[in-house]
C-alpha cells in the first residue's frame, strides 16, 4: 500500500512472496534407491521466498510552475518459470554435457531503482521534464559450474549469480492539445550492461571451455538512443495525428563465416554484443472525420502504419549485420533441380523485418 501527503510525498512498502509447490533437483551424487524412498533421499522441498520492498517518492515545488521529483524503490521479480521447472523429470545423460536443470530454489531477482528529475512549464500548456535514472539488478539468473553426477557425467543448473544495471536519462517536451494543436517529443539515452543477457549464453560459453565472464557487456536490449514524437491537429469535426519513432539498433555478436580464419594464430572471435543492428524508423498517421449520415453519428477514418514503407531490420545475419544478405550464400548453390526447395527459401526471412506499410480505411456508425 501507499500513502500521500498533499500530493508531495508518497511512500509505500510492498510485501512479496513466492511459494513454489515443487522440489529441488536431486543430490549431485544420486544413488539408485527404491522408488518408495527416492524422494526422501534424493530430493528436498523448496522453501518459500519473502521480501519487503520499500519505496518512496517526493515531489517538491520550487516555483509555481516547476517541481523537483525524487524516487527510490526496491522491486521484486519472480524468475522466468522455465528457469524454475526446466527438465522437471531431472533426466541427465551419462556424459560431460548433461544439460541444464531447472532450479525451483532460485531467489527472486531484486532491482533497486533511483530517479531524480525536474519538471518546468516553459510556455502556455507546454512543459519539459528531465529525469535521470539508475537501476541496479542483483541475483540475475545465471548458470552454475559443472556439477558431477554419480557415477559419471555432469550437469548444470540455473542459479542466482549474475548482475546487470541500467542507467541514463529521459528528456520530455510536451504540449497539451489547445488551439487546434498538441504534441510532444521524448528522448532517452540509456546504457544497459550486465554479465550475461541470458543464462543460455553462459551455458554455451562453458561448453566452449571459456572462463565465466566477469566484465560488463551491453545486454541484448541495450538501446542507446530512443526518440519518440507525436503531433495532433484538429478542428470541430476532424483530427489528424502522427506518431513516430527513431531508435538506434540493439547489439549483436558479429562472426566470420565458416572457414575464413584458420591456423594456429586464428582469431578467437569478436566480443559479445560488440556491433549494432541497423537503426529503426517508423511513422504512423491517423485521420478521422465526424459527420451525420441518415441521422446517425458516423466517423470516417484512415490509419496508415509505416507511412514511408521502410524495411526495418530487427534481426540480422551475424556475418553481415544485415537482414538482407549473408556471405554464406556466396559459397553454395542457391538452387538444386534435384531437390524440393532451395537455400533461397532459408535466406528469405520476412520474420526479421518490421511490418510493411498498411492502410486501414473504414467507418464507424453509432446508433
PLM region descriptions:
Residues 1-63, 83:
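Signature of Gram-negative outer-membrane beta-barrel scaffolds
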Residues 138, 191, 244-264, 278-282, ...:
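C-terminal beta-signal and adjacent terminal beta-strands/loops
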Residues 48-52, 110-114, 165-167, 223-227, ...:
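Residues that define the transmembrane beta-barrel architecture of outer-membrane proteins
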Residues 65-68, 125-128, 180-183, 237-240, ...:
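Repeated loop/turn-to-beta-strand initiation elements of outer-membrane beta-barrel proteins
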Residues 61, 67-73, 79, 83, ...:
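Membrane-embedded beta-barrel scaffold of Gram-negative outer-membrane proteins
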Residues 5-6, 133-136, 141, 148, ...:
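Gram-negative outer-membrane beta-barrel transporters
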Residues 56-60, 116-120, 171-175, 185, ...:
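Residues on the lipid-exposed face of transmembrane beta-strands in outer-membrane beta-barrel proteins
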Residues 9-16, 52, 81-87, 94, ...:
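Outer-membrane beta-barrel translocator domains and adjoining extracellular loop/strand segments
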Amino acid at each position: 500500500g501507499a500513502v500521500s501527503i498533499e500530493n508531495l510525498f508518497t511512500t509505500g512498502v510492498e510485501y512479496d512472496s513466492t511459494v513454489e509447490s515443487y522440489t529441488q533437483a536431486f543430490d549431485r551424487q544420486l544413488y539408485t534407491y527404491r522408488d518408495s524412498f527416492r524422494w526422501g533421499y534424493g530430493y528436498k522441498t523448496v522453501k518459500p521466498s519473502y521480501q519487503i520492498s520499500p519505496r518512496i517518492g517526493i515531489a517538491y515545488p520550487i516555483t509555481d510552475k516547476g517541481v523537483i521529483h525524487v524516487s527510490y524503490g526496491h522491486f521484486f521479480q519472480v524468475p522466468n518459470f522455465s528457469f524454475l521447472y526446466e527438465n522437471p523429470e531431472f533426466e541427465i545423460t551419462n556424459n560431460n554435457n548433461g544439460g541444464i536443470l531447472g532450479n525451483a530454489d532460485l531467489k527472486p531477482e531484486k532491482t533497486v531503482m533511483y530517479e531524480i528529475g525536474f519538471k518546468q512549464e516553459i510556455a502556455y500548456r507546454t512543459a519539459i521534464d528531465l529525469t535521470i535514472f539508475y537501476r541496479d539488478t542483483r541475483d540475475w539468473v545465471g548458470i552454475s559450474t559443472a556439477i558431477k553426477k554419480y557415477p559419471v557425467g555432469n550437469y548444470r543448473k540455473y542459479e542466482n549469480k549474475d548482475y546487470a544495471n541500467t542507467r541514463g536519462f529521459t528528456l520530455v517536451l510536451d504540449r497539451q492539445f489547445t488551439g487546434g494543436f498538441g504534441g510532444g517529443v521524448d528522448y532517452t539515452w540509456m546504457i544497459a550492461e550486465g554479465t550475461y543477457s541470458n543464462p543460455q549464453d553462459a551455458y554455451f560459453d562453458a561448453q566452449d571451455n571459456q572462463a565465466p565472464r566477469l566484465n560488463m557487456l551491453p545486454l541484448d536490449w541495450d538501446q542507446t538512443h530512443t526518440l519518440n514524437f507525436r503531433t495532433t491537429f484538429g478542428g470541430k469535426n476532424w483530427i489528424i495525428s502522427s506518431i513516430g519513432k527513431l531508435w538506434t539498433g540493439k547489439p549483436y555478436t558479429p562472426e566470420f563465416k565458416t572457414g575464413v580464419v584458420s591456423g594456429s594464430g586464428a582469431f578467437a572471435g569478436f566480443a559479445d554484443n560488440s556491433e549494432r543492428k541497423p537503426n529503426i524508423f517508423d511513422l504512423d498517421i491517423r485521420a478521422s472525420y465526424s459527420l451525420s449520415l441518415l441521422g446517425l453519428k458516423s466517423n470516417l477514418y484512415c490509419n496508415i502504419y509505416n507511412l514511408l514503407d521502410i524495411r526495418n531490420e530487427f534481426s540480422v545475419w551475424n556475418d553481415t549485420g544485415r537482414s538482407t544478405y549473408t556471405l554464406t550464400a556466396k559459397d553454395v548453390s542457391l538452387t538444386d533441380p534435384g531437390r524440393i526447395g532451395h537455400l533461397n527459401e532459408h535466406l528469405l526471412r520476412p520474420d526479421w523485418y518490421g511490418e510493411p506499410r498498411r492502410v486501414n480505411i473504414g467507418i464507424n456508425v453509432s446508433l
